[in-house]
Curated annotation (Swiss-Prot):
Its main location: nucleus. This is Transcriptional regulatory protein ASH1. The lineage of its organism: Eukaryota, Fungi, Dikarya, Ascomycota, Saccharomycotina. GO terms for molecular function: DNA-binding transcription factor activity; sequence-specific DNA binding; zinc ion binding. Residues 88-105, 305-324 have a biased composition (Low complexity). Induction: Expression is controlled by the transcription factor ACE2. One of its GO terms (cellular component) is nucleus. Residues 290-300 have a biased composition (Polar residues). CDD domains: ZnF_GATA (cd00202). It is found in: Nucleus. Keywords: Chromatin regulator, DNA-binding, Metal-binding, Nucleus, Repressor, Transcription, Transcription regulation, Virulence, Zinc, Zinc-finger.
């Protein structure tokens, strides 16, 4: 504030005002202090004029006895050098004058000493630098291809050298060699084919298939063949039309049995038909007659028949014209066997429970009605029957069964859990219980043993 006040006083003081000696000395000390603390851009460039920090300080001007007048002249005319300013370059110790160059009394005095290093460099503004046109080259830059130098040492890995060496070698052989001829090696030429001295087979030279009968595969597709070429094949090969008929006749002949021989018939006469005895025997096959004999001779059966119920039937003779295709004649004795029973549905098996016989009664599951099981398991009652393997395992885990005679379902573990989650219901007879998931009837649950 003292510097600002002094500057303000200098402007407002008149010429008749007289200053005291102490005021002049005080003003001179402030001027030297401001000049020593002030930094400029030229001070940073003036590196060569700086003195080493280890050197002893010396006065910049050698004066014996500086007087007050000489101090004023030096301070007014000569700008102090950088040796008098602070050695510290810390930004905290910078001092900038708040006064403008026009109002400051120190800035009005220019130093007569000048050097080329004090010239300030003027840089362009940011806007001017951004508005400059981009630097573009008029001609495109042509870069040379990167070729490895190692491959140049080996002619077989470098194509230009390989071709030059190969053609040079061929020219040298053709010129210098007298007993070597390149015509013997026609494989070097792409258009030439090797010639063989060995004889070819006559079957290969003279093909039995005419060229007109072949289908030109690369130039003829299925579409063009169906439109044009197949008519020529039909004309050239009429046997193709007869092939289908011949194949049908052959198949028909294979299905028909061969005609029986007369000697074979005499040696093995056909068995006679028999009537069933007391409903236990099945109905026999119809009688077989032959044109060679007018009647059949009965053959003794392997089982006993009452003489009153055993009858013989003599069929009328048939001529050859009315003979129908006959099955092959069996050479073994006629033994009637009970035909296999047809597989019944589950409802039929449940309606008709199996009859207990004293010999080999077939087993049927009383729950699902199946007669096929690897093993049989006990049910809830020995009198009613047994369970198959799957039903027996389910009943062993759940101990639950449907009481409906038409259902008799044994729920699986997941089905039984679903029945229990629905809860018990009250039925018409007033008994509470779980309902069957299949038919809705009451399910009987036995305690697990």
């Amino acid at each position: 504030m003292s510097l600002v006040q002094s500057a303000m006083f200098n402007h407002h003081m008149g010429p008749s005002h007289t200053r005291s000696r102490s005021f002049e000395l005080f003003q001179e000390a402030k001027t030297l202090r401001v000049a020593a603390c002030k930094r400029s851009y030229s001070d940073d460039l003036n590196i060569s004029t700086k003195r080493a920090r280890t050197a002893p300080p010396s006065p910049p001007y050698e004066t014996a006895t500086p007087t007050r007048a000489s101090r004023l002249v030096i301070s007014n005319l000569v700008k102090p050098t950088s040796n008098l300013r602070s050695r510290s370059l810390s930004p905290n110790k910078k001092f900038s004058s708040p006064l403008s160059p026009s109002s400051s009394p120190i800035a009005t005095v220019t130093s007569p000493i000048s050097s080329p290093q004090n010239i300030k460099i003027k840089l362009p503004s940011i806007s001017d630098a951004l508005n400059l046109p981009p630097i573009t080259s008029k001609e495109p830059v042509k870069l040379k291809p990167i070729v490895p130098t190692v491959s140049l040492d080996y002619f077989d890995t470098y194509k230009p050298n390989d071709e030059n060496w190969r053609y040079g070698l061929l020219d040298k052989i053709a010129k210098e060699s007298k007993h070597f001829h390149l015509n013997q090696y026609n494989y070097l030429n792409d258009h030439a084919k090797p010639s063989f001295d060995s004889k070819l087979s006559s079957k290969i030279q003279q093909s039995s298939i005419a060229n007109g009968k072949k289908i030109n595969f690369p130039y003829e597709s299925n579409y063009t063949y169906l439109n044009k070429t197949y008519l020529n094949d039909v004309k050239n090969y009429p046997e193709y039309l007869e092939l289908a008929a011949e194949s049908l006749l052959q198949l028909k002949e294979r299905q028909l049995p061969p005609p029986p021989l007369q000697s074979h018939q005499k040696q093995h006469p056909p068995p006679p038909p028999h009537l069933p005895v007391q409903g236990l025997l099945p109905v026999p096959a119809p009688p077989v007659s032959h044109f060679s004999s007018s009647y059949t001779t009965p053959q003794a059966p392997t089982f006993y028949h009452p003489p009153s119920q055993q009858q013989q039937q003599t069929p009328p003779p048939q001529t050859l014209h009315h003979q129908q295709p006959q099955p092959p004649i069996s050479t073994h004795k006629f033994i009637p066997i009970s035909p296999p029973s047809a597989k019944k549905s589950r409802s039929d098996l449940l309606k008709s429970p199996p009859k207990h016989h004293h010999h080999h009664a077939p087993r049927v599951c009383i729950s699902c009605g199946s007669d096929q099981s690897p093993c049989w398991r006990p049910s809830w009652s020995i009198k009613q029957g047994q369970l198959c393997n799957s039903c027996g395992l389910r009943y062993k885990k759940t101990k639950a069964r449907c009481l409906n005679d038409k259902c008799k379902k044994i729920p699986a573990k997941g089905e039984w859990t679903l029945m229990q989650s629905k809860g018990k219901e009250t039925f018409e007879d007033g008994i509470e219980g779980y309902s069957c998931i299949a038919c809705g009837w009451r399910v009987e649950v036995l305690p697990k043993s």
